[in-house]
């Protein structure tokens, strides 16, 4: 019942937002495409599970530093620290790794979760990375149809997932640029402790709903670059996104 009520609420909010400002559609589409890319990446990496993954896991997490590096690399590739945290907990439950290794992986995952934000901040707002998405999607979809070869098909899902991520970032960036011309979110900026609490709560809520701190962070950076939120409020949103991403691990 709670999930249905949440879904109806989200639809109502989106419907109202589209009615108030049609330019919001591009931002929402960017978030949707970005999340679709994450799902595609997840499906791609699932294709490589099994004995090979377990053997690889033992070799790459036998020390604390290796566990830390493993968490960083896997989160960078999969673009989901929540997913890595849940998978780590399942590895612990299955006895594949010990507690110290699990802690190292989760620490690394929280470091790796910043890579998406660095990508957008360093390149996404200056370089048209959406242009790289098109060939990735084309080659990825071709590989996805290789049903007789599990590895190639998994690689296709991963390549298509990266393409969707880049395309989603491009849509969000362009959407906020157009959105700023018709509606100014900065008028709702709040300073002081009240603003910190409010925007942290918004960051938590957005991450829980989308199940992705990456999506929340990238959305925040795109909004900040378009002048739609203040720097202080953007920091609060980033804090909220990192708090919200821990909820999945706790539930797991």
Ranges and model annotations:
Residues 1-10, 60-65, 109-110, 132-136, ...:
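Short hydrophobic alpha-helical membrane-embedded segments
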Residues 1-35, 132-139:
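Transmembrane alpha-helices
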Residues 8-15, 67-71, 113-117, 137-143, ...:
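Hydrophobic, membrane-inserted alpha-helices
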Residues 16-20, 120-121, 140-154:
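Membrane-water interface regions at transmembrane-helix termini and the short interhelical loops
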Residues 25-88, 149-225:
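Membrane-embedded alpha-helical segments and adjacent helix-loop junctions characteristic
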Residues 32-40, 93, 138-143, 163-167, ...:
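Alpha-helical transmembrane segments and their membrane-interface exit regions
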């Amino acid at each position: 019942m709670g999930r249905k009520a949440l879904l109806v609420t989200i639809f109502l909010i989106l419907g109202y937002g589209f009615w108030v400002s049609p330019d919001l559609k591009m931002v929402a589409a960017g978030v949707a495409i970005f999340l679709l890319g994450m799902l595609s990446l997840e499906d791609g990496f699932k294709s490589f599970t099994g004995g090979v993954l377990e053997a690889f896991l033992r070799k790459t997490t036998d020390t604390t530093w290796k566990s830390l590096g493993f968490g960083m690399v896997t989160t960078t590739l999969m673009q989901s620290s929540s997913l890595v945290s849940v998978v780590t907990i399942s590895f612990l439950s299955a006895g594949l790794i010990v507690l110290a290794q699990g802690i190292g992986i989760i620490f690394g995952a929280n470091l790796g979760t910043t890579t998406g934000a660095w990508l957008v901040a360093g390149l996404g707002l200056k370089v048209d990375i959406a242009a790289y998405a098109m060939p990735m999607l084309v080659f990825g979809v071709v590989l996805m149809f290789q049903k007789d070869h599990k590895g190639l098909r998994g690689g296709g899902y991963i390549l298509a997932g990266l393409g969707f991520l880049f395309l989603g970032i491009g849509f969000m960036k362009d959407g906020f640029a157009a959105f700023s011309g018709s509606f100014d979110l900065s008028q709702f900026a709040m300073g002081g402790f009240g603003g910190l609490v409010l925007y942290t709560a918004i960051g938590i809520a957005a991450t829980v709903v989308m199940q992705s701190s990456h999506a929340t962070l990238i959305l925040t950076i795109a909004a900040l670059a378009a002048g739609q939120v203040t720097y202080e409020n953007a920091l609060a949103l980033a804090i909220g996104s990192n708090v919200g991403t821990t909820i999945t691990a706790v539930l797991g």
